[in-house]
Amino acid sequence: MWIKELELKHYRNYDHLLASFSSGLNVFIGNNAQGKTNFLEAIYFLSLTRSHRTRADKELIHFDHSTVSLTGKIQRISGTVDLEINLSDKGRVTKINALKQAKLSDYIGTMMVVLFAPEDLQLVKGAPSLRRKFIDIDLGQIKPVYLSELSHYNHVLKQRNSYLKSAQQIDAAFLAVLDEQLASYGARVMEHRIDFINALEKEANTHHQAISNGLESLSLSYQSSVVFDKKTNIYQQFLYQLEKNHQKDFFRKNTSVGPHRDELAFYINGMNANFASQGQHRSLILSLKMAEVSLMKALTGDNPILLLDDVMSELDNTRQTKLLETVIKENVQTFITTTSLDHLSQLPEGIRIFHVTKGTVQIDSDIH
């Protein structure tokens, strides 16, 4: 899939913008604080209905307006789709082909994106919540049912934690009802995550071995707070551990086990990647991003759109070449932001160049 056209009204520092793109590589050049990242953020927001930079929608609204409108024309294998998101103080409205969508799980996945931003380099050593978010964003685009089950899980988890914080003593019968619901939704969330990580590991290791010239292997490990011996009995084991932890959870005022506490670990040649070098970290993250692209296509039959936000300067020539070779081979529409073309090596033909200045975007040329 690829985005043919994007229109922004009152988004960040863009008062009004209408732009069309190449189905291949699109490069946005400009000094810092001109709107390059805002532009990629808008594409990300149109896809996922959320920003990767802020949780406050009001920060997305142009300073002298009260509403935001984003519309995009997306070319999928199945045909052209029009997406629209409108933001105001009354909330947000999402539409597909002018039809309002009642549930996010009906909207997300229509346009898939993979974002590679500087903060992704913290994925290995950052907080566990970053790695869970990484899984949730990809799975939510690939499997809409996952978003629904995760939403139900989080709703019951909130209810259970609220009860634990307010209760003066344990009502075992009431907790048993919540435990059953939490274990049911949570087990399905974990099953989806385990299948996804197993598939992602295969793709990521293939890319990582290519980047390292066969010197390194990459493995991923989904580490659950729920102890189980096989995937088919996650529900029973989760339910048992919830019941066993009633007293501990009551004392701590929160739920001690479940997918909300699960971890994702990375290993290079069998060694925990927390102890890897900076160069190895870059190769690992690059391998993951290329694996995301490959896996989304394998599981859905359509390519995602790749957003590279000021990361090419973080990669040496070898890693840049591997990345560009992948997107060209897979025919992935790619958006790159940079302050200068000097940061990019071995650019292929057919690139569309845009210049970004103070919230305006001007097309330069197509390189043939």
From Swiss-Prot:
Q: Does the keyword Mitochondrion apply?
A: no
Q: Which GO terms describe its cellular component?
A: cytoplasm
Is Transport one of the keywords UniProt gives this record? no
Q: Name one GO biological process term.
A: double-strand break repair
> Entry's HAMAP family?
RecF
Q: What is the lineage of its organism?
A: Bacteria, Bacillati, Bacillota, Bacilli, Lactobacillales
Q: Tell me which residues bind ATP.
A: 30-37
Q: Which NCBIfam families match?
A: recf (TIGR00611)
What this chain does, per the record?
The RecF protein is involved in DNA metabolism; it is required for DNA replication and normal SOS inducibility. RecF binds preferentially to single-stranded, linear DNA. It also seems to bind ATP.
Would you identify the family this protein belongs to, as annotated?
Belongs to the RecF family.
One GO term in the molecular function aspect is:
ATP binding
Supply the source organism for this entry: Streptococcus pyogenes serotype M12 (strain MGAS9429)
Domain of life according to the entry: Bacteria
Where are the annotated coiled coils located? none
Give its localization.
Cytoplasm
Q: PROSITE patterns annotated for this entry?
A: RECF_1, RECF_2
Annotated protein name in UniProt: DNA replication and repair protein RecF
One Pfam family it belongs to: SMC_N
Q: Which PANTHER family match?
A: DNA REPLICATION AND REPAIR PROTEIN RECF (PTHR32182:SF0)
**Keywords, in A-Z order:** ATP-binding, Cytoplasm, DNA damage, DNA repair, DNA replication, DNA-binding, Nucleotide-binding, SOS response
* InterPro entries per UniProt: DNA-binding_RecF, DNA-binding_RecF_CS, P-loop_NTPase, RecF/RecN/SMC_N, RecF_2
Where this protein primarily resides, as one coarse class? cytoplasm
